[in-house]
Amino acid sequence: MLEYVTKSESETEAIGEKLAARLPGGSVVALYGGLGAGKTAFVRGMARGMGLSARVSSPTFTIVNEYLGPRELIHFDMYRLSGADELFDIGWEDYLSRGAVCAVEWSENVEDAFFGDEIRVRIDKLSDAERKITIEGGPLC
C-alpha cells in the first residue's frame, strides 16, 4: 500500500502521472472518493504519465471518454450507474479486451464488475487543498 498527502491539484495530478507511467496495458484503476475529491485531477495526471496530450474532463454525462495516443486511456465515470450490469451493458468487457488502461471513477457503484486485480485509489479530502491518496492492489503496490 502506498500513501501520499498532496497540498494542491497539481500535486494530485503528479501522483497520477507517476502511477500511470509504470502501468502495463490492460490495467484497471478503480478510483474512490467523494464529490470534488480530485478523481478527475488524478486521471488528468495519468493521461500525462501515459504521454497523452488530450484535455481530460470528467465523463459524468457521457459515461466514457477515450484518449488515444502512444497508449490508450479509457476514462469511466460511474456516478450515474446503479450497478455492474449497467457497466457490462455499455461494453465493459470490450473495453477491457483492447489492452487499454481503464480509469474508473465512482468505482463503488460497479465493484461487482472488477476481477480482483484492479489497482484501488482512494482520495480523501482533508481540507480545501489537501488530499490523502491511498493506492493498493495490482502489481505496483
Model-derived features: positions:
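Short phosphate-coordinating micro-motif centered on Lys-Gly-acidic
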Residues: 2-3, 48, 82-141
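Conserved lysine of the Walker
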Residues: 39
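Short beta-strand-centered segment that lines the nucleotide-binding/catalytic pocket of NTP-utilizing
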Residues: 52-67
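N-terminal pre-Walker A segment at the start of P-loop NTPase domains
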Residues: 1-18
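Hydrophobic anchor at the beta1->P-loop junction of P-loop NTPases
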Residues: 29-31
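Phosphate-binding P-loop
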Residues: 20-25
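P-loop (Walker A) phosphate-binding loop of NTP-binding proteins
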Residues: 34
